[in-house]
Amino acid sequence: MGQACGHSILCRSQQYPAARPAEPRGQQVFLKPDEPPPQPCADSLQDALLSLGAVIDIAGLRQAARDALSAVLPKVETVYTYLLDGESRLVCEDPPHELPQEGKIREAVISQKRLSCNGLGPSDLLGKPLARLVAPLAPDMQVLVIPLLDKETGSVAAVILVHCGQLSDSEEQSLQVVEKHALVALRRVQALQQRRPEAVQNTSVDASEDQKDEKGYTDHDRKILQLCGELFDLDATSLQLKVLQYLQQETQATHCCLLLVSEDNLQLSCKVIGDKVLGEEVSFPLTMGRLGQVVEDKQCIQLKDLTSDDVQQLQNMLGCELQAMLCVPVISRATDQVVALACAFNKLGGDFPTSSFTDEDEHVIQHCFHYTGTVLTSTLAFQKEQKLKCECQALLQVAKNLFTHLDDVSVLLQEIITEARNLSNAEICSVFLLDQNELVAKVFDGGVVDDESYEIRIPADQGIAGHVATTGQILNIPDAYAHPLFYRGVDDSTGFRTRNILCFPIKNENQEVIGVAELVNKINGPWFSKFDEDLATAFSIYCGISIAHSLLYKKVNEAQYRSHLANEMMMYHMKVSDDEYTKLLHDGIQPVAAIDSNFANFTYTPRSLPEDDTSMAILSMLQDMNFINNYKIDCPTLARFCLMVKKGYRDPPYHNWMHAFSVSHFCYLLYKNLELSNYLEDIEIFALFISCMCHDLDHRGTNNSFQVASKSVLAALYSSEGSVMERHHFAQAIAILNTHGCNIFDHFSRKDYQRMLDLMRDIILATDLAHHLRIFKDLQKMAEVGYDRNNRQHHRLLLCLLMTSCDLSDQTKGWKTTRKIAELIYKEFFSQGDLEKAMGNRPMEMMDREKAYIPELQISFMEHIAMPIYKLLQDLFPKAAELYERVASNREHWTKVSHKFTIRGLPSNNSLDFLDEEYEVPDLDGTRAPVNGCCSLEG
């Protein structure tokens, strides 16, 4: 079945319930409630253009120009519109005065370009009306002199003076648009004035009959003058009634009508027959028969000249048999083209009903339209502009309707079908969306198809819809059965009759076809007109934008729902029960001294503390730093937060909770031993400590490059911004803060809350070593010139340095700890290397268990990364010297291990094996330490 139209007709026989929009699930992650979103404002430019588009007279033009300029320009105080009166005088009627053409005004008129100034000079001011525009004006005000040009004569046809404020770029653009539309409105008013004859004085014909006879007026002339005096309506139907009644009386015809010719000369239409206004306009094609030749030849014809098809069409329209007919072309003086056919039917008198129309009747009709034709064509032109105005307003309303249904594609498509059918007066409308190489329709006039088995799918290169989708061009088919692409099998099976089709493409902002709309059977015409094509083209733009944005909105929503669902699942498994935090706080917060007497010394190893005691140790450190009291943090909330953070860590060999605890403890050591409060604000130190706790949340044991190479979900979310894992860690921290009962910053002011989150983001992102290497030169410069507490950049750099030193703090402990940490790190690295090999990629040497030589890798890491960091710390804080010395000591240990295994060789092919053998390496104090990765850590 290769035709879109047929399928859509077939599916209209079933009614389908509308699809219900999916209900959002999950919890939204947010920072703090913002100000309410701004309400949409009215489109003042569109309103201004619509008002200009409706102008039909001078008074309306002046008012529309004033309203339009007031709508788009700032602080408009005065608008004067001067129109050409005679050959050179430019006159304003409100108040009445003539435009002085001197000074700035003369300059603008001669240059024929808009001019702005800070007021008019004395030479410009000839009277009181312009006195308020005298220079100098206020600094924020100006006078605009806007000449409107008549392109035919090349002269200025009107001038507008505006007293307003200074313009922005957007207001300048709006003014240019208004100028163009004002000129179009002026031309339209001038054209209407030229075509409309002066009103005939309402005097008695009988009273002036003798005078007109003396002037040589005939009886026809007097009747025509009387008729013209009655043609004051702006409605073309009323004008036709008066003219046709006159023609019926003068030609003795039983019926008279006007067959109006469409702009494309493809059809005739009739709304009035004699004294009767038809309920619906009757239209029929002009491509066949003698009536079409009349439009081309401009010659009168009678009944005997018509074809049988012509006669049948006219008899169907009149509802009676034709005995006689006279058809006279009505020619426009402006275009010299036939605009209508005046027809008289069945002449009374004489041998009625066989009487024929005479040359005198032909003269009567021609004489009538010689005087009334311009009135009729002007009124028809006015009605057309009114129709265009209504269509523009309808399109604007359609756009509003479409853009309020972006949340559901099916509802949007249903709205598109309804609006398209109403705009074009079509019997049926179908919309197909392009899905790869198929056109898919699941929304029809009858409703929405929920079951995929009922949706229509056709190849994108078959049938009428396929042709439009392939070419991207609109297709108007007057006779469906005569078109080679139409498949009439569906019509034969359903009994439906497809007469004509208008099929148009729907494109996105990149001019790519994303769908096709198909209108079937014009209701009030023989086929779809050129006007319908233009309307469909304009309508398709709104359709394309709304569909593209709706599909994008759907994808974003689906991604958000998945994210919310994943977040809900994670939070469910991380949920802290009331018993857990109650048990943690049962005996109050333990003093730091009770944990270990050396807890606040750099020599203390936090990994020696049992993991079950680490949550209390976090609370103890926060209390010792006085953050709980200073920021009035609720203890149950803090306990829940700490337990949630602990549960937020996975269990890879190294990047687990014990690593986060060690990093947090080192931050505490820096605070206690280096007196950080003399360098940083309290909120910065607090943010540093919380960031240490959260800096590796939900770490998967793989680095950023692996996330990008494996095209993981995290990479899709964050790769464009860089620091994939670090951004994920921060997002997880925000998710925990947004969990009920875990927001430890809940009592912060909005300003402090935002600053705390900004600090956490920057500090956590600083754990990416790539970031550290980018700012290393800035850190060196800061150390050279000395730290300046009043320099905000120094604050940011110091926080980044402190975070990195905390993250690598295991290197500042004893050799046993350093050796154990190396084992954990390389187990994690080798696991990633194995995954990369399984993906078909070649891992880095440090992650390849078959190639990595750990001692050399550790020496390189300590020389190029760790030691420079702690050297900078020593330069800024002399008390941190012991940290640098201990890192240097551990580097010497690795040098000796490397030398030993260079001589003796590795114990086996596995690079981790040497850490599991009982080799001894002389410690720096002369004792011998077993090189055993499983030995207990010093406490």
From Swiss-Prot:
Disruption phenotype: Abnormally elongated mitochondria. This phenotype is reversed by treatment with the PKA inhibitor H89. Protected from ionomycin- but not staurosporin-induced cell death. Belongs to the cyclic nucleotide phosphodiesterase family. PDE2 subfamily. The keyword Glycoprotein does not apply. The gene is Pde2a. GO terms for cellular component: axon; cytoplasm; cytosol; dendrite; endoplasmic reticulum; Golgi apparatus; mitochondrial inner membrane; mitochondrial matrix. Zn(2+) binds at residues 659, 695-696, 807. GO terms for biological process: aorta development; cAMP-mediated signaling; cardiac septum development; cellular response to cGMP; cellular response to granulocyte macrophage colony-stimulating factor stimulus; cellular response to lipopolysaccharide; cellular response to macrophage colony-stimulating factor stimulus; cellular response to mechanical stimulus. A lipid is attached at residue 2 (N-myristoyl glycine). The GAF 1 domain functions as a dimerization domain. Its EC number is 3.1.4.17. It catalyses: a nucleoside 3',5'-cyclic phosphate + H2O = a nucleoside 5'-phosphate + H(+); 3',5'-cyclic GMP + H2O = GMP + H(+); 3',5'-cyclic AMP + H2O = AMP + H(+). Binds 2 divalent metal cations per subunit. Site 1 may preferentially bind zinc ions. This is cGMP-dependent 3',5'-cyclic phosphodiesterase. GO terms for molecular function: 3',5'-cGMP-stimulated cyclic-nucleotide phosphodiesterase activity; 3',5'-cyclic-AMP phosphodiesterase activity; 3',5'-cyclic-GMP phosphodiesterase activity; cAMP binding; cGMP binding; GAF domain binding; metal ion binding; protein homodimerization activity. It comes from Mus musculus. 3',5'-cyclic GMP binds at residues 430, 445, 464, 487, 498. cGMP-activated cyclic nucleotide phosphodiesterase with a dual-specificity for the second messengers cAMP and cGMP, which are key regulators of many important physiological processes. Has a higher efficiency with cGMP compared to cAMP. Plays a role in cell growth and migration. It is an enzyme of class 3 (hydrolase). Residues 577-901 form the PDEase domain. A lipid is attached at residues 5, 11 (S-palmitoyl cysteine).
